[in-house]
Curated annotation (Swiss-Prot):
This is Small ribosomal subunit protein uS17. The keyword rRNA-binding applies. The lineage of its organism: Bacteria, Pseudomonadati, Pseudomonadota, Alphaproteobacteria, Hyphomicrobiales. GO terms for biological process: translation. The gene is rpsQ. NCBIfam families: PRK05610.1, uS17_bact.
Length: 79
């Protein structure tokens, strides 16, 4: 099964070797047909503590690292 890759913005880097990434998705509301935005936060592994708040990053699904972390940061797009 292929690994999922998501893009989001780093919203917290206070934990050691961990960043919190907010991933936003958009979809059409089934009744109103209006575009709705929903977001979800993922904890991702950052081995070198190199990503800071505001960075746009790609995260990839991986084997569980801890109770909450099952994603790793792959690369950064921009600030």
């Amino acid at each position: 099964m292929p690994k999922r890759i998501l893009q989001g913005v780093v919203v917290s880097d206070k934990n050691e070797k961990t960043v919190v990434v907010r991933v936003e998705r958009r979809f059409a509301h089934p009744l109103l047909q209006k575009t709705v935005r929903r977001s979800k936060k993922y904890k991702a592994h950052d081995e070198n503590n190199q990503y800071k708040v505001g960075d746009t990053v790609s995260i990839e699904e991986c084997a569980p690292i801890s109770k909450d972390k099952t994603w790793t940061v792959v690369s950064a797009q921009s600030k």
